[in-house]
């Protein structure tokens, strides 16, 4: 029963989404019903794609026409020339760059633009960034000044009453360490803000970790919810798979030891996790922020969580997914040494992994309707499914290549090949065989044998390869005999070729 399902899935996945094809095939009781539904959907999708293509062409032509019209209008406008302001300047400035900056930042003074351009050594991009920052600072200062004016005007009489002097507690004269000073800065801005909801807090934490570790937010989302919303375990797993840890050398590791030791001493976390966080964040303040997040969340959410080499085991479904993912990472990488059977087996395994990831993506998408953070996890699973699909296609192609080079120079076994693959292989092998045998005498030609099988593994136990290869050889004007799942090619059928030319 699985043969016709696999054949329909393989054929219609080229025109429709593979997850949709898989669902229709699994819901159908017989091949005819499934084929009718899939055929109708494929025809409809092809028609839609053609209509969409023409709509896109018309839209692109209209946009191009609008852009040309806009360019013509802009070119008619005379640009103002500011280069006369450089006559009395002692700075060596590029007139073209200055003219562009002056026209873009007309609200800033000429002296400010000249100083910034000289500081950036006539670099247009750096100068633009510097001037944009200056403009933003000016606007923020104006807003703060207006706010202070409003607050000052509302100060009452009681605010000017004399306050009693209170003695400040005398602090020890011991100098603050680097960690202590940075800890005070981190504590001024709490990691988990009580005024925000749990969802908002998690969203802000994910954005912060994305900027520090340079990891996609979808991957952090997936890891966070896979570990039951526990930040300590999530951070440990992200750090463990982070790229810089695999590229670090012993000399570079020694540079981080002093700061990591201080972090471990003051946070109470292990030296290993402190070192790994410091290497991945590549900044002391960022590492301190991540460690404070671990410390705070393990106290508030998880209790006494120890970041050891072994974390708590997930449930049975998570274990199954992890085993399948580990299995996919251990698949053979020496592609050229694989046989056709091995390539087909690997392709089937990758297709199973693809279907599992698509199923997980659908589940996470349904959950995202109540919690938007699951949307990133759904995207992550969908991306994994696409990667597994590409790998399955790759190994399927390798299987066809291996099959094409199998057998001897005068024989070919097509077991395991699809009709399309078999046609390509037969054409190549028969052409190569005839190139060697064409110059020999007709009585000395050694025939070429093609084994197609009797169709015992086809849908409905009907042979498909044999009729397809027979039609192909007839079209290419070969002389052959076909019987009992085997085709013997003797050479070119010259009479058939002459009749077709006539």
Swiss-Prot record:
Its main location: nucleus. GO terms for biological process: nuclear-transcribed mRNA catabolic process, no-go decay. Keywords: Nucleus. SMART domains: SMR (SM00463). GO terms for cellular component: cytoplasm; nucleolus; nucleus. Residues 150-184 are annotated as: Disordered. The keyword Nucleus applies. It is found in: Nucleus, Nucleolus. The keyword Disulfide bond does not apply. One of its GO terms (molecular function) is endonuclease activity. SUPFAM superfamilies: SMR domain-like. Residues 411-459 form the Smr domain. Residues 157-171 have a biased composition (Basic residues). This is Smr domain-containing protein C1235.03. It comes from Schizosaccharomyces pombe (strain 972 / ATCC 24843).
